[in-house]
Structure formats: C-alpha cells, structure tokens
Amino acid sequence: MMRDLDLDALQAQLAGTPLQEWACELPGQLDAKLAIGHGDLARWYGAVQALPALPVSEVELARRFAFGGACDDASRAQLKTALQGLIPWRKGPFELFGVHIDTEWRSDWKWQRVAPHLDLTGKRILDVGCGNGYYMWRMLGAGAGSVVGIDPNWLFLCQFLAMKRYLPEQPVWHLPLAFEELPAKLQGFDTVFSMGVLYHRRSPIDHLLDLKDALVKGGELVLETLVVEGDAEQVLVPEDRYAQMRNVWFLPSVPALERWLRRAGFEDVRCVDVSTTSVDEQRATEWMRFQSLPEFLDPADHSRTVEGLPAPTRAVLIARKP
C-alpha cells in the first residue's frame, strides 16, 4: 500500500517549497500508521486491487467527476463489484467507465456553491478532513497545481486509491493522517480547506489557529461548517446528539463565526453561502444503505432535527491570513 500512496511523487512535487522537510518525514510516519492499520483494511485494499486494468481516454474534473474509455461488459461488472466492496460511499458522485456511484451526499451541489468564489489556479492546497477525496479531484478540475488531503479514515483512503489507480499522474495525494499529526506551523499551503470539520472540534478557535498556521502569508482559508441563525453572541452547544451525531460541539451563527475568524487573526473574512441541507442532497442510496438525513429530521417538521434542534444549515466562509 505504501507504493500506492505515491510519496516519491509527492516529495518531488514539494521539493524546494516550505513543505519539503515534512514530505521527507512522511514515509516513516505512514509506515508506522500502516503497521497499526485497521481490522477491515485488508478487505478494503483487496477491493482496490480487484479493480480491472482499463485504459482511461477521457477525464472530466471541472464540471463533474467522470472518466472512461474502452470497457466491455465483463470488465464493467468486475469494476462495479470491486467498487461495491468499498461501500458505504458518502461523498461523490463518481462516474467510472459507465459505472455511476450514487453517493449519500450530492457533494457536487456543495462544490457548485463554493467554487465560484475561489481562484485555485496553480495553488498548492491542503484539504483537512478530505474524506474520500471527491473535493480534491474537483479542486484539480478548478486548476489547482497540487492537492494534499488528510483524513485518518482507512475506508476513505481506499476509495481515493480506487480513483487514483486510474488517474496516477494527477498531482493529488491522500494521507491517512489526522490534522494533529501534521507538524505545527507548516506555513506552506496557498489554500487550506476545512469543510465539515469545525463542529467536530472541542476547541474550534484552536482549529482555526492551526489552519492559519498551515497557510503561507497571504494564503486563503475556505471554511464550511454547520451554523445557526442569530447575532454574534449566538452559539448552539447541543446537550447530547445533534442530528444523531454524538461528536458535535459548537454551532455558531455566521456573525459569531466571522468574529472567531477575526480573533484567530484572519482578515477579509466574508460569508459567501448559507444553505440548509435538503433530503435530496443527503440521503440513503444503493451505495450507502444506512440511515441518512431523512431519518435525522423530525418527520413532522423538517426544519428541526429529531432532537428538536434547528435542522442542518451550512455556511461557507473565506478568509485570508495576513
């Protein structure tokens, strides 16, 4: 699996940048992580290895994620079976050789809300909590120079490797690391994304400070998180679960979140989108058969969660490191 992580290419990509030293330390760090592994990792990685060798002649990452080429019915069936071995698929959708992975989330809808506000051309990007890498591929489609994603979830890594197997030359890497496992004050990325992470953090201000420390001077943060209505004094701390999630800590209002970003030292703070998540955007599918948003909302009132709290609403904020 270490070979699939493609660290030699990552080190070459980061040579001569502030991230060069960190890149040189990654093989040892990831070797240690792989030694610990996960009970299902062999099965998931086996699904990746079961993918048929197929030539890719068409790639689309700008308008959607899709690639294809010559593929007979037997190979397509083998491809679908291997990809089903990586269920549940949460972020997407993906289209490979005519196989459509209808993921739990319509992540392309979120990307349509975020992308118009960004200029990623030639940027060196870090995606914190990157999941299976869907957004990283779309960042490349928007012109990014290189994208590094971190997420400690092994299933998400294998889902990413399934795509990278067919697109090995793309400058995108998924590292099975938590944000806390990165060195402090990397100060090496032009743009840092944190989408769907902040509300899982017990100390959200510290998270914002750590994100700032990963950026170069003048670098840009793209922050997406759950919010509530209200003024700068309004922050929701759930008593227990929120939309059936246990690990949700702070849901600020947009004005409160803007204040947090300014207190963390960011400038040019602006909110570019606020959207309530619909049951069309997050739902169970053939590729994710567990409970989803429809089960997490009050069946009589979709403006509330089953706990009686405001239904999930997400804001996208952009800020600059001075």
Curated annotation (Swiss-Prot):
Keywords: Transferase, tRNA processing. Gene3D superfamilies: Vaccinia Virus protein VP39. CDD domains: AdoMet_MTases. Its EC number is 2.5.1.-. One of its GO terms (molecular function) is transferase activity, transferring alkyl or aryl (other than methyl) groups. Signal peptide: none annotated. Homotetramer. This is tRNA U34 carboxymethyltransferase. It comes from Ectopseudomonas mendocina (strain ymp). The gene is cmoB.
